[in-house]
């Protein structure tokens, strides 16, 4: 359970600040475009003077956008395809939950726990610090907390 005050803070304050700051950085270099996923997949292509701002704020925007997209008041189960992939990778849904919980609870300071598809096309549980996104590591996030 996450209380309304925490949700308001993250949605209306934190997430909005990430969007505003990412947009301000992008305005300095209109030639690079506005596709944050593409830019963060190749951070070295981002001009040095805005690179860290986009890593922090672009990552914060993408991370929170996925979080909001996945949130629902109803309890949901993974699709049959995802459930089979979880079982094949982790042994069971319960083992996946244990790995995901460990990634979330052992992250020192702020950050995210992720279920991602890695470069080899396999599921992986990982963790990133602060607002770093697994996209910068060539991974596709499918669940984030």
Curated annotation (Swiss-Prot):
Pfam families named in the record: Sod_Fe_C, Sod_Fe_N
SUPFAM superfamilies attached to this UniProt entry: Fe,Mn superoxide dismutase (SOD), C-terminal domain, Fe,Mn superoxide dismutase (SOD), N-terminal domain
Documented effect of changing residue 17 to T: In strain: CIP 103216
Enzyme class label: oxidoreductase
Name of the protein in question: Superoxide dismutase [Mn/Fe]
Positions that bind Fe(3+): 10, 64
Lineage per the UniProt record: Bacteria, Bacillati, Bacillota, Bacilli, Lactobacillales
GO molecular function, one term: superoxide dismutase activity
Family: Belongs to the iron/manganese superoxide dismutase family.
Cofactor(s) the protein requires to work: Mn(2+); Fe(3+)
Record key words, sorted: Iron, Manganese, Metal-binding, Oxidoreductase
Impact when changing residue 44 to D: In strain: CIP 102922T
Catalytic activity: 2 superoxide + 2 H(+) = H2O2 + O2
Binding site for Mn(2+): 10, 64
PANTHER family for the chain: 37S RIBOSOMAL PROTEIN S26, MITOCHONDRIAL (PTHR43595), SMALL RIBOSOMAL SUBUNIT PROTEIN MS42 (PTHR43595:SF2)
Known function: Destroys superoxide anion radicals which are normally produced within the cells and which are toxic to biological systems. Catalyzes the dismutation of superoxide anion radicals into O2 and H2O2 by successive reduction and oxidation of the transition metal ion at the active site.
Binding note for cofactor: Binds 1 Mn(2+) or Fe(3+) ion per subunit.
Enzyme Commission code: 1.15.1.1
GO cellular component terms given for this protein: cytoplasm
Chain positions covered by the region annotation Disordered: 126-145
Gene name per UniProt: sodA
